[in-house]
């Protein structure tokens, strides 16, 4: 299916959106951007202990479905987030990010709502070593993954289907200022096993073979991450490898390789993301094909197994004039169920888009 999306109008309002930055850890430096508290009260900022940011984005969209030939239109709220963060001392810091347009019921595993992206505290032991704990964005590499959602018109299928705000602990070590190695242990899911997969869940890894899924005793995620910067920040990398415990003896392994060219008026990145799932974590393949159709007695809550996803993402920004930015983005993605002949390399999708942006 080919789907075209036209942004007839887009509105993005933020107080300190650039300072809010990305998803992982503190989301970037505040730089010289004022917090909303300063702007509203006109009080000079004396310290960095309390900063409040509101981020809002909405758009009017026209979509074309090439299969049916139908055009549809809508006006939609994309993002409405409140963020509070700060440095209580030169060593102790915190961050809260909460979405106003997501479910607020607490999940069974971590007791956080889906609406709460981040609620964490951290401690800098010194310039090289830090520890963060709480609910955070998992430290998968790649630049689309960590980009401020305010600036994403359409995510890749892979990132759009990832569930990555989890309770956990991150230990970060910087042997030199431009290089960081981080390790993370977090929950694999927000909810209990039965909440994620349903009662009596099964997996179909190959035709005719059904396995009952059992809850793992330690449903955790383990990630190793490298963030590198070279040539005074002109070339940056965000690479990661991790394994997630889906169920008993069922794991999801993921590799991410992100590279960025960062020039004064031109920025370009290229990401590769690959997922190798014993149990379909992204659930793209399982939503497009009924696993029960490939094995008898699979039950109502059946998922595909041995699923492999690839995602290639590239994006460029060019600030060709003051207050103006030209953005182009392309995506190519594949999906394959390796043990079911009919579903080997069954899915190839691509997307491309561009925008002309004005920042008053």
Question: What are the language-model segments listed below?
Answer:
Residues 4-11, 18-59:
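N-terminal periplasmic/intermembrane-space "pro-region" immediately following the signal or transit peptide
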Residues 34, 38, 78-82, 116-121, ...:
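Hydrophobic, lipid-facing positions within transmembrane beta-strands of outer-membrane proteins
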Residues 40-64, 69-191, 228-233:
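Outer membrane beta-barrel
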Residues 47-49, 219, 224-339, 346, ...:
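Detector for outer-membrane/organellar transmembrane beta-barrel domains
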Residues 54-58, 96, 133, 171, ...:
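Membrane-embedded beta-strand positions of outer-membrane beta-barrel proteins
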Residues 64-71, 75, 104-115, 144-150, ...:
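Outer-membrane beta-barrel translocator domains and adjoining extracellular loop/strand segments
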Residues 189-191, 250-251, 306, 358-359:
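Outer-membrane beta-barrel porins/channels
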Residues 190-192, 198-201, 209-220, 228-230:
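Solenoidal tandem-repeat scaffolds enriched in leucines and small polar residues
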